Amino acid sequence: MPKTKSLLNGIGNQKETERYYDDWATNYDETLKNWNYKAPKKAVDILFNLKKNIIFNLDLACGTGLFGEELIKKNNMIIIDGCDISSQSLKITKKKNLYRNLFRQSFEKKIKLNHKYDSVSMIGSMTYCKKPNLLFPIIFNYLKKNGIFIFTHRVDLWIKQDFDSLIHSYNKLFKFNYKSRPLN
């Protein structure tokens, strides 16, 4: 694991976050397995309970592809594109051969795409979003009509950033239909 005081050091600082995950990439999957981190699997289960016919998914901040692995287990015909700022994480993801396209960039910047997705995922990375209020309109542009955006967020930051109010302010853009209890 990188020699950084905490994951919070990366919040709002893209270069620091990129460096943090580049340094951690080779041990990331093993570390999260040791933490018994189940958010990717639980998020996939929730996603497929909400929408069964997912063909295309965009995985924002895909990291080493843990969410993509769970998607493929659920539906091996799904087509996944991903983006991440960590070049080292993307190298690991590419070796797993799960994603059709991988983009090296921040999820806070719009990706130039020629198509829309049935679902967009952002699992374990909302922590690093500097301006979540600007992210939702970007996400909306990636989704097909009736598409699903699934994300996880830390409980402490959900409260601090008043995410309930933020989500409520986008009710006209999105249909919010599920809020789970905290996941690990």
What would you call each of these model-derived segments?
Residues 1-26:
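N-terminal, positively charged/glycine-rich alpha-helical extensions of SAM-dependent methyltransferases
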Residues 58-110:
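Class I SAM-dependent methyltransferase SAM/SAH-binding core
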Residues 133-145:
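A short glycine-rich, Lys/Arg-flanked "PGG" loop and its adjoining helix->strand segment in the class I
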Residues 146-154:
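Conserved beta-strand signature within the Rossmann-like core of class I S-adenosyl-L-methionine
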